[in-house]
Amino acid sequence: MEEKEFKSGFVALVGRPNVGKSTLMNYLVGQKVAITSNKPQTTRNRISGIYTSDRMQVIFVDTPGIFKPHSKLDDYMDKASLSSLNDVDLVLFMVEPEDMGKGDQYIADLLKEVKVPVFLVINKVDQIHPNKLLPIMDSYHKLDGFKEILPISATQGIGIDDLLNTIYKYLPAGPQYYDADQITDRPEYFVVAELIREQILRLTSQEVPHATAVVVDQMNKHQNGKLVIEATIYVERDGQKGIIIGKGGKMLKQIGIDSRKEIERLLGEKVNLRLWVKVQHNWRSDPSFLKQIGYDKKELG
């Protein structure tokens, strides 16, 4: 039997907010490396998930959802999405199983300038009857620019084998860039900060989640064997600080409990998590503060 050629490459996940890019990446790598929520703009930074098998290694670049910017942070997120298309081997343009709206069309127009193959990936097909999916797929087939059109469900695993087989077909032969057990290119403290932010997204509402940034100040082993993590939650106004802390500190305690469970699951060890809340007025439009907490445009090349 002929041995399969080993292939490797970088694949960008692109689409509107909340189409399931992070969910797909987490499914493919088998562990949570990108946070998810039902709120727009959950992903802020580029983060890569690494899928390795005996025939290929794929570095999936999960980008912030593309939308029209309203603040410096929004502008950073949009540039983070678009910059990831400059140096990848494939682009997966993710949409929901519905007719193409203005947001999708905006992205489709941007992708016409991309020089690498673009796959249209229709996610959440488990949420629609097959009879309704077929005409939607037909309408997408009439559009130019897509090398492949693939229906999947990132939560149920539907169509994932076909997706991986198709990616393999298009990838170039190449080396294994990362160890087989490495699942992300981001350091642990980055993923830990994101897991805390995920719980804030889940537990708070209105403007509070989007006015929040999390910075891990230190991660140190304690004498009792527990890992001690100290992190600061930044908000823009005193009122938001009060909401994060909650009556009698209840909300902050709940954020801490739920975050600790996710962090322990990720790291596989007991964690002592200590959280502080600070006000940094209008941080989303403050370039120097954005740089200080890791939203550095130098990263965008």
Swiss-Prot record:
One of its GO terms (cellular component) is cytosol. Its main location: cytoplasm. GTP binds at residues 15-22, 62-66, 123-126. CDD domains: Era (cd04163), KH-II_Era (cd22534). Residues 41-45 are annotated as: G2. One of its GO terms (molecular function) is small ribosomal subunit rRNA binding. Residues 152-154 are annotated as: G5. Residues 7-173 form the Era-type G domain. It is found in: Cytoplasm; Cell membrane. It is a peripheral membrane protein. Residues 196-281 form the KH type-2 domain. Residues 62-65 are annotated as: G3. Residues 123-126 are annotated as: G4. Coiled coil: none annotated. Monomer. An essential GTPase that binds both GDP and GTP, with rapid nucleotide exchange. Plays a role in 16S rRNA processing and 30S ribosomal subunit biogenesis and possibly also in cell cycle regulation and energy metabolism. This is GTPase Era. The gene is era.
